[in-house]
């Protein structure tokens, strides 16, 4: 089983991430869904043995990180974006996000930007916003086994 920690919208507040990583056994990867990529880079230096995937958010204008990525972890295809380019704050049904994600046939879609935790089951995929480490004080864990994804949102 692959266990992934998912953070977003840390906005310079990485202490909770460090505590969570230190207290979490068997972490297979970390995903950061933007705002701030500098925080994700700092975590990658602190934990060089844990794969860390990240995208840039609306507050990462100078970052060279991509707007979205598709990765494979534990046999699952994961689409990651911050969400500002997909207008997630303004589209009640997440239409643009779903259109972009559908291109890669994902098992898991991760976005941030709204600072609000969110889970939706969409066809064979789970759409997940872990919330904000800084503001809603939440993060998520995904467990993947044989391509099957289960997620949970946790309070910090």
State each model region's role:
Residues 77-114:
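Internal catalytic-core helix/loop-beta-alpha segment
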Residues 51-89:
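Helix-adjacent hinge/juxtasegments
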Residues 1-49, 60, 66-67, 144-149:
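N-terminal active-site segment of His-dependent metallophosphoesterases
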Residues 48-51, 125:
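A short helix->loop->beta-strand "cap" motif at the edges of active sites that frequently abuts
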Residues 2, 67, 73-74, 96, ...:
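Binuclear metal-dependent phosphoesterase catalytic core
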Residues 6-8, 29-35, 53-58, 80-82, ...:
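Active-site neighborhood of phospho(di)ester-bond hydrolases with catalytic His/Asp-centered motifs
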Residues 11-15, 37-41, 59-64, 86-90, ...:
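Active-site environment of divalent metal-dependent phosphoester hydrolases
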């Amino acid at each position: 089983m692959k266990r992934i920690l998912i953070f977003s919208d840390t906005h310079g507040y990485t202490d909770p991430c460090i505590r969570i990583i230190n207290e979490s056994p068997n972490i297979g990867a970390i995903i950061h869904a933007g705002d701030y990529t500098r925080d994700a880079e700092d975590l990658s230096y602190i934990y060089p043995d844990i794969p860390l995937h990240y995208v840039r958010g609306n507050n990462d204008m100078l970052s060279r990180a991509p707007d979205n990525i598709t990765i494979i972890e534990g046999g699952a295809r994961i689409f990651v974006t911050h969400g500002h380019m997909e207008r997630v704050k303004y589209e009640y049904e997440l239409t643009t996000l779903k259109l972009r994600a559908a291109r890669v046939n994902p098992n898991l879609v991760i976005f941030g930007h709204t600072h609000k935790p969110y889970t939706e089951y969409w066809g064979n995929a789970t759409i997940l916003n872990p919330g904000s480490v800084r503001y809603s004080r939440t993060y998520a864990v995904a467990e993947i086994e044989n391509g099957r994804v289960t997620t949970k949102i946790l309070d910090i």
